[in-house]
Amino acid sequence: MNLSPLQAISPIDGRYRNTTESLSKYFSESALIKYRVYVEVEYFISLCEIGLPGLAKFDKANYGKLRLIHEQFSDVNAQEIKDTEKVTNHDVKAVEYFIKKQFDDLGFQDYKEFIHFGLTSQDINNTAIPYTFKLALNEVYYPNISNLISKIKELATEWKDVPLLAFTHGQPASPTKLGKEFLVFAERLEIQLNNLKNIPNSAKFGGATGNFNAHHIAYPSVNWVDFSNNFVNEVLGLTRAQHTTQIEHYDQFAAQCDALKRINNIIIDLDRDIWAYISKNYFKQRIKEGEVGSSAMPHKVNPIDFENAEGNAGIANALFEFFAAKLPISRLQRDLTDSTVLRNVGVPMAHTVIAMSSTLKGLNKIILNNDAIAADLENNWAVVAEAIQTVLRREAYPNPYEALKDLTRTNQKITADTMATFIDGLNVNETIKAELKQITPFNYTGVF
């Protein structure tokens, strides 16, 4: 069955399919099956490499043929496995039977009982899933977040000299530079991105209850811990958890979810700030011919990209938070609740990719409105009160804070003339008065 985006239940496979399609290579049902096959095949090859008696005659020259099983894996193969699952009612066993059939076709039937040798399903799932998650991070997520950070830095450079009225508690505060405000988000994202990259992609590989019972009973002379560490860490490029139950701890995966959530929180914060600046008319948005902003109000040009991003990041975070709280908890040596949860691991990643894409799209649309920014600065001369009282403190002037408070903390508008009159009335020398009169909302922006 070919599912049209029009029939998809979730918008990530429907409305937003063009944005999320790259993730289907890692998180679709077909992808999960493919990478289960990958792990099973590579495991068989690794068993051959340690010289087990039952595999001693397997020709290493045939490794390439084995790897073609997963390298050329197709949706037709995936459907064949799904058809087998209808009989077995077990997804991983269906994968095992598929590979055994491939061995029969290749003439390797004498060795097929070493497929899935000594393993439980979670040895496959708890390697295949973190492997696909690692691939998705490296090939989709990291490039997307890097593009977003690059755009933020680009705007920070472009607008590094633009003075901007700051707002704390929603009220005018000491001015800042627009470029610096973008650097705040770039710095935050880079720090959290680095934290995410330093979290190991943890995997489990140790038999039915994590003790290599079956492996050890069959070949007690083999150091199965060393074998598995090499297979998981070196062949698969993951990090093997040393002491487990039937399943992976998921503590490191929970840490990855928490890190992704923190990054999304920063994106939400950025989206809301840009939304607020647009509402203040500090930014205008590029208008595309033919687009409509409202079904009723013809004039509307809404900040829909930032609102879309905020909504999708919020959905992603709800799931990341659930994964981080739920997955590390499992009854005794294992219950099945992690299985259905892990099948949804691509969902928050998809919403995250949509959020990043929408934010980037929105940033590419915004146009600086210098006139509105300058007008707000000109209308808020009270914000230089901090500067004046600080210089007066330096000069040991009595009660400067209180004097500026009495001047500015009223309901009267403070203008350049108001400040000049106040400065003229100060009992300080003319040099200090001249210094104070040089301070304006446009140049009182600190060191950035």
Locate each region found by the language model.
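Catalytic-core signal marking the mid-to-C-terminal active-site face
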Residues: 2-29, 64-65, 292-448
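Charged, flexible cofactor/metal-binding loops and thiol motifs
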Residues: 92, 126-142, 157, 163-329, ...
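Residue-level "edge-of-site" marker
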Residues: 60, 246, 405
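A helix-coil-helix interface module used to build multimeric assemblies
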Residues: 1-212, 219-230, 293, 399, ...
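A structural signal for small-residue-enriched, beta-sheet-centric alpha/beta enzyme cores
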Residues: 121, 216-220, 235, 240-244, ...
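Intrinsically disordered or highly flexible coil/loop and linker segments, enriched in small
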Residues: 49-56, 108-109, 142, 158-161, ...
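Generic, well-ordered alpha-helical scaffold segments in large soluble proteins
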Residues: 42-47, 98, 102, 136, ...
